Amino acid sequence: MSNHSKVSVPTATQQTALKFVLLIGILSFFADFTYEGSRSILGPYLASLQASAFAVGVITGFGELLGYSLRLVSGRLADRTQKFWPITILGYVVQMASVPLLALAGNWPLAALLIILERVGKATRNPPRDVMLSHAGKQIGYGWVFGMHEALDQFGALFGPLIVAWILALRGDYRLAFAALAIPAVINLSLLMLAYRTYPHPEEMEGNPPDIQTQGLPRVFWLYLAGAALVAAGFADFPLIAYHFAQASTVSPHLIPVFYAVAMGVSGTGSLVFGRLFDRFGFSILIVLTVIAALFAPLVFLGGFWLALLGMAIWGLGMGVHESIIPAAVAPMVSPQRRASAYGLFTAGYGIFWFLGSAMIGFLYGISFSAMIAFSVVLQLAAVPLFLLVARQTSQPQQNRGNSG
């Protein structure tokens, strides 16, 4: 009963934590609006600047790889200096400035530099920002915090490309579309400075530090990273799924974006639900959702129109799990003093295995559908025993832990 009353009547610190998460979530909405809007047209824009298909592949692939690997550096730097806000602000400034500057790129090498800088900015700001969010999670539940944040992220990622598509439909001008994205970029940076001034010390929400080892990272973290890496490696990227829909004529070309929108809607809504369920039930909910999400591959690659739509909804469910529960579970495993390094390492490893797995899935697509689907499903299900081990080594569900202080 006492636990229930705590949730029903939030303390002042819990109210502060909720307001902080909502503010970070809203500024993240405008960040995703900006860079996902730009990324939806990067391919054709580079082509208009006479970049070859090979150049486009190298630019985007190298940008993604750099964007994940640099999180190791950013996370370690944040832990060492404890300058979470300055590093976060630097990352956002670099990222938000890079997007509208694409309107001024006169050639594809300059555009490539800006595209890579945008990824560097994201890599710089993510680990310290996630640590600050995790402080709020100590008060209101790690799953709820990351679920709310991801839901707002996803809606930004949905509206940004839609507005860009609307601008292109009206004017057919890539440069105008990039220039228009300066508006959400400025809103993002304004809200970022408001958050910094309003909540200069989010670590105060942590309360009493948890009794977790501070030397190195605990064994349970490495087990969890191994399981998450398997899930990431088995998950197909949407461009390959869209490519298959077009090649197999499963879905009409004009409906493919609708399928993606359905997936994003499930992902954004699911993030909220899954985060709350994780706080209440712990790792058992992650295990159940991992098994369900593994079913997307046979549905999207072998099914007809309606089964493919169901598969995309399940794919979106998986994305919601990836973006809410999976990062939320890292925070209580690691002491606050090591958390930025842990997030940097975790997201770098997760991203690199996603990249390698996507490459293998794409390779198998041209050889054998059966092998490709088996690769995807087996790798995701192989994470379940590791998650079971992690569940045994972690304590009570995260909401209880968050409210115990």
Can you describe what each PLM-predicted range is?
Residues 114-155, 329:
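Cytoplasmic helix-loop-helix junction between adjacent transmembrane helices
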Residues 338-366:
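A late C-terminal transmembrane helix in Major Facilitator Superfamily
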Residues 70-83, 168, 270-282, 365:
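Helix-to-loop junctions at the C-terminal end of transmembrane segments
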Residues 176-193, 372-388:
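Symmetry-related core transmembrane helices of the 12-TM Major Facilitator Superfamily/SLC fold
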